[in-house]
Amino acid sequence: MYMKKITGLMLASVLAMGVAGCGSEKTATEVKKGEPVKIGGLFDITGGTGDVGTPYAEGEKAYVEYINSKGGVNGHKIELIGDDYAYKIPEAQKLYQKLKSSDKVSAILGWGTGDTEALRQQVATDKLPFFSASYSEHLKDLKQSPYNFLTAASYSDQARTVLKWIKDNHKGGTAKVALIYNDTAFGKSPIEDAKAYAKEIGVDIVDEQIVDLKALDTTSQLLNMNKKAPDYAIINQTWGATSTILKDAKKLNLKTQFIGLNWATGEGLVKIAGDASENFIGVVTHAFPYEKDLKGMKDVEEYLKSKGQKLEDKNQKFIQGWVTAKIMAEGIKNADKMTGDGIRAGIEKINNLDLGGLAANVTFTKDNHAGTNKIRLAKVKNGKFEVFTDYISYK
């Protein structure tokens, strides 16, 4: 009996210690007036998507520095604490735990699809609003992703809009389309939705090809694709793989019109692919720095000038990162309490936020965390992307 009592006391003690230990792992408590709001950053600088991840991260950091130079948000400076996780999901999970437990951040600026989807349950448990550079359709599901927000059109919505544009503009019978993507959560994200929508509107998906993010030769895939004679090929890649596809397509003298989703699009593609990028069509979710007449570009130009830089020094992915951080700052501005829950509620108050033309206006509510489904399209002409549509949607 005595031993049972001692055992019970020891068990109670261990449980109490466990509870105390769990308590020490909680995320940040409410930030007091005048204290900085800490935001975590998951960056890909050296990994498989570092070609676009590096300028994107630079844009996020730049906006935070800019808004802090203006006094911050509602008396709070923003402290962005982040690191390179090299596009590796286990490293993203480790970094997330550090940001949550050690740094006590109140929200997260994330990056990839695989890591964002792997973390979404943890993010919900920890009540940390999470903006990702992944525009996976899965993140629209509020039951599974109640703290995730999409700040641009989802990959699936991008693909649907491209297919709608093809349907509306193709001449001569039923359009035949191929899909080219990498074997990652990012690459595969829009594929099933694209196939379903194509069937719905009467566009034929005739082929699919897998191309690695780091591919240096895509000849075999393109030869196989060409057997199906697609009129169009939709690419979901970043600049590196897309440039390889375009260069090999030029060598093979393919007549297919290549159309890339947002991460395949940008100045970096033209720089790498050269003449092979001519007439490539890209999905444009965010403005190019050379669109200088846009109202929102004035703030970017002001910041860069203070650093001795010019708009010409930056690319579209820098603008994309800038806009993402700007939307987060707006959510913080709207928050009644500087906690994860408070910031989420602040983001859900954003209604038709005017981004000065840097991106489509965004709206969030308690029932909808997808800010927009609109994109623009641009074609490479004489080595430069020229936008040829307004903001459009498949709806």
What is each PLM-predicted segment?
Residues 246-320, 391-392:
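Extracellular/periplasmic periplasmic-binding protein-like sensory domains
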Residues 45-48, 85-89, 113-117, 135-140, ...:
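Solvent-exposed loop/turn segments at secondary-structure junctions
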Residues 306-318, 329-384:
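Segments of small-molecule ligand-sensing domains
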Residues 105-207, 257-281:
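Extracytoplasmic ligand/sensor domains, especially the bilobed periplasmic-binding protein
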Residues 26-31, 51-58, 70-142, 211-218, ...:
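Beta-alpha junction/loop-to-helix N-cap segments that form part of ligand/metal-binding clefts
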Residues 32-37, 58-80, 172, 199-203:
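Signal peptide-proximal N-terminal region
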